[in-house]
Every structure is written in structure tokens, then in C-alpha cells.
């Protein structure tokens, strides 16, 4: 099983925090590891190879480099989704189900979830929109945990 981690926000020592997170999930992926750090997002990935062993390195990017994904799981119908996306003009570089998710996000945004069959958890950082989209499969076979802590004293001002 793979492992993903990350955070969004203006954080000092982003690299150190991401490294600690990656070390906590090292047992989830002996085959590969990758990180993404830019502006307000940091994503990490530990890989256990299942599909497309040669081309599944993550984080994975779209052609422009402004959409990035970390993904844990398997999309059972990725070939069907891929055919649909190719008909809409998307060009694929490899056969991984991860790349299929990037193109599905570009085409359908959150609506992509209704097209997916499988067990998965993923996080997509969209640099143009400055947004993080995270999802897991409908049955929770691949859990996805998130948390947020915000505090202030005294009250913030603009």
C-alpha cells in the first residue's frame, strides 16, 4: 500500500515538516518516494508499485506543471476513463491510473468522482486556482484523514 501526506498554508520550515510526515509513512511505500513543495502547498508520496511500475512516480503533474497529484489506490476502470478523456483531446504520457486522475480533474474537476470505480485516496493541488481537492473512494476502503487547527489571540485584523 502506498501512502500520501501533505499540507497547505504559509508555513516556515515547510521542508522539515514534510520530511517528518514522509518519515512517519515510510512503511507504506518501499519502492519510491517523492515530494512537491511550492508556494502554499506541500505534498508527499511513498509508493508500493502495482500498476505501470516504470511510469508511476509521484507526485505527478499535468503537462503545464500547474496541477499536481498524490494518489494511493487503484482505479479499476481507468482504461475506460482514459478512452473518454482521449476522445476529449487529452494526451497521455504513460499507462498509469494516476495520470488518468490528473486529466479527469482537468476535465471534470470534482465531478470526476462520479466516473471513478476503485479504491483510492488522493490530493490534487491546483496552482492556478490555489486550491486543494482531496477525495477518497465512496466506501472508505482507502481512508483519507485530514485536520486543521487555527487559533488567534487577540482577534485578527485585516
PLM region descriptions:
Residues 1-153:
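N-terminus-centric sequence/structural signature that marks the extreme N-terminus
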Residues 154-158:
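A short, hydrophobic C-terminal helix/tail in secreted or cell-surface proteins
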